[in-house]
Amino acid sequence: MIATLRYEFRMQIRKRSVWIVPALTLVLFVLIGGSLLRDLFDPAERPPEARLAVVGLALQIHALLAIGFGCLLADRLVRDDRLRVAPILDATPASPARRLAGKYLGAGTATAVPIAVAYFGFATAYAVSSGSWSALLWALAAFGTVFLPGLLFVAAFALTVPLLMPAPLFRVLFAGYWLWGNVVTPDLMPTLSGTVIHPLGGYPMAALFDFAGIDGQDQWAGPIPGAALNFLRPDPTPLVAWLSIALLLVLAAAALTCGHLMRLAERTRS
């Protein structure tokens, strides 16, 4: 698994698109209009607390860059079949399960590197400009509890769902899912936003960081009066936040397991 992880990491980190896609996304977002990415460096506009600034930054960058993250990973698993190297890999000592785990962790980590660079870069710049060095500790905590579970969830489905459909179709559907299930508010239409299976990290933000938006008026977790799927929106508590993280990881493991079984079944038929 380690050898596969290293190989996949090196292959993915060298792809220009892994760096260009998040860079262009951030540049375009900043140029479109005012946002926290710009306000962080304006003493009159930036949030008064380092915690609010860093968690708000995590929310914006996660919401923006996770779409590209999933799309960039969509062809990593099916590529072996397309290039007809799967039979060669099957002849190596590494088991298919270990190779899948190595590909998942290696390619996923490499694709997440630019996201981490962007996030910690902005957090460091904020800490320097504001003098609030506690922002770096908040950034580490937010990355581990908000970013990582969501990215692991997205990576698992981005690798395995293209086994069932063409990668371009998955990218289109995934972009639609991400906007519907994470950005659309529950009072507009039925959505998974604000539920315990919300990969944007609503429950960790609300329960672990007491985050309700920069102005304190947003609700990222918990029941919404009149909204559908409120049975998936218990009141946000630290216990429920950790349960939400665990559910995302369990779903990621389930997706990988299903992908592994599908590939084994395909090998058996062939």
Identify the residue ranges that each predicted region occupies.
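Transmembrane alpha-helical segments in integral membrane proteins
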Residues: 67-81, 154-168, 240-266
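Terminal transmembrane helical anchor/hairpin motif
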Residues: 38-44, 48, 172-270
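Secretory targeting signals
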Residues: 27-75, 101-169
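Transmembrane alpha-helical core residues of multi-pass small-molecule transporters
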Residues: 24-28, 106, 176-181
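Aromatic- and glycine-rich beta-strand/loop motifs that create alpha-glucan
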Residues: 1-25, 266-269
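Hydrophobic core positions of alpha-helical segments in small-molecule transporters
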Residues: 21-23, 101-102, 173
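Cytoplasmic juxtamembrane interface segments
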Residues: 1-6, 77-86, 153-193
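Short helix-to-coil transition segments within interhelical loops
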Residues: 88-97
